[in-house]
Amino acid sequence: LNPNIADSGVGDVFVGNVHRFCSKFLFANGLVAAESSVIDEEDAVSILARYTGEDEYFVFGDFRRRREYSLIFHLESMMHQIAMGHPKALRSHTDCINGDDVKAMQRICSVCGRAFDAAAMVDIYNNVETYRDMTAADTADYGDRMIIQRLLQKMQLAQQYHRYKQQNHLLDFHDLLLLTYDALNADPEQSLYKRYTWVQVDEVQDLNQLQLAIIKLLTARSYRTVIFLG
């Protein structure tokens, strides 16, 4: 779009997709380490394959297995949203937690004598080994034990992926959105970060609810113009 903006002040206009804006926002405001790098899904698969022990090229070539990896990446980002109290409407790829996973968490909570709620989900996610030990002696039938094991394994892999990114200053595309949303949402007075009085969004139908929420948070409260095209 830049060549079509015939204005001497075009250098002050940001043109790009939401992920690119979020990356610029995070680095410009010192919200991530300066040496951080952004990774794509292929990089993410390579990282996770370190923990599964699988050949990453096998994963790339196997649609079913690659989808299972994607579900783990989505689980990592969704657990961040649950922990941070993001509205349910902003969560995407909710299929990363299926009916068996819910049943497994309910069973774990039953064994531990606690209510099944968001706090319990986050606690199980953050303490996989503890809950694995606590449920090891559970007398539930074989089927229930298997779904608990699968859930905890999936959560463990998501945690390992998360820690690897943190230790190596890596950000995936989910992180760009989540960290930007967190920062803007924590600045309700609009005093810490720049807001925009003119925002134009093209191909709005391609944006998910989290991206739209970020755009809303980026918009100044008064004297604003927001144009959505699609």
PLM ranges: what are they?
Residues 1-97:
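Conserved P-loop NTPase-based nucleic-acid remodeling module centered on helicase motor cores
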Residues 2, 7, 12, 40-43, ...:
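Acidic-enriched, low-complexity/disordered segments with a strong bias for Aspartate over Glutamate
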Residues 5, 10-18, 32, 38-39, ...:
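Extended aliphatic helical segments
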Residues 6, 28, 33-34, 44, ...:
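A sequence-composition feature that detects small, non-aromatic residues
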Residues 14, 40-44, 143-230:
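Conserved helicase NTPase motor core
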Residues 56, 60-61, 71-167, 210:
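Conserved ATP-driven helicase/translocase motor core recognized via long
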